């Protein structure tokens, strides 16, 4: 079972529907107490960085999410859910993120239409399990006004460009993030979600053999 975190800042049902369509059971989690029952989680999100972190704190999600990330189970952030994985966001002032990945979330430079909305290509920087079966320069759907700035090359799996190059798929170990919306990016976005579902199932199988 894949859990989708409900903190009032995401299009939860479209992600849930996409996973079920692919054959991967999913449920929306309304309380941190439900985390232990799922084998992988997705943190969606739309809106502002500060509002998202405030909502996560208000609903008691921050420490449980950090603990879950450290458990080694698959963790995927989507759009704003990817951005809050990082250390600091600069939207409406400077705000602390979850700190699971190194980097800052900054605004696109002046001169570009904001938000960056629509289809854009993903240039694959390195192989990773989420990109298996997806061609280089495949199109994905984006909606965002801020982007991640990180000097840690090891976490950059895919890049896009909107006046400046920006990370579109990031991660290391079990914590990953997609700046685009895979649930709106058929067919390749659904392939990425399928790859995540396979990873969750494989990880759960390995864990059960260890126990």
From Swiss-Prot:
The UniProt entry annotates the active site at: 79 (nucleophile), 181, 183
Q: Where is the Glutamine amidotransferase type-1 domain?
A: 1-206
State any GO CC term. Answer: cytoplasm
Q: What is the top-level taxon of the source organism?
A: Bacteria
Q: Does the keyword Cytoplasm apply?
A: yes
Q: What does this protein do?
A: IGPS catalyzes the conversion of PRFAR and glutamine to IGP, AICAR and glutamate. The HisH subunit catalyzes the hydrolysis of glutamine to glutamate and ammonia as part of the synthesis of IGP and AICAR. The resulting ammonia molecule is channeled to the active site of HisF.
What name has this protein been given in UniProt?
Imidazole glycerol phosphate synthase subunit HisH
- Native organism: Desulfitobacterium hafniense (strain DSM 10664 / DCB-2)
């Amino acid at each position: 079972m894949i859990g989708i975190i409900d903190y009032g800042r995401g299009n939860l049902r479209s992600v849930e529907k996409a996973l079920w369509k692919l054959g991967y059971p999913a449920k929306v989690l309304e309380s941190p107490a439900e985390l232990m029952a799922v084998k992988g989680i997705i943190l969606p999100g739309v809106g502002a960085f500060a509002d998202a972190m405030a909502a996560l704190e208000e609903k008691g999600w921050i420490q449980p999410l950090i603990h879950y990330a450290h458990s080694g189970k698959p963790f995927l952030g989507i759009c704003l859910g990817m951005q809050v994985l990082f250390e600091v966001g600069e939207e409406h002032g400077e705000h602390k993120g979850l700190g699971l990945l190194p980097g800052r979330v900054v605004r696109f430079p002046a001169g570009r239409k904001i938000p960056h909305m629509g289809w854009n290509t993903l240039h694959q920087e390195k192989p990773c399990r989420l990109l298996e079966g997806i061609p280089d320069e495949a199109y994905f759907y984006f909606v965002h006004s801020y982007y991640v700035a990180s000097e840690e090359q090891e976490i950059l799996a895919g890049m896009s460009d909107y006046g400046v190059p920006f990370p579109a798929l990031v991660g290391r170990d079990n914590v990953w993030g997609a700046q685009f919306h895979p649930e709106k990016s058929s067919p390749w976005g659904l392939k990425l979600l399928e790859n995540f579902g396979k990873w969750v199932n494989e990880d759960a199988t390995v864990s059960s053999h260890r126990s």
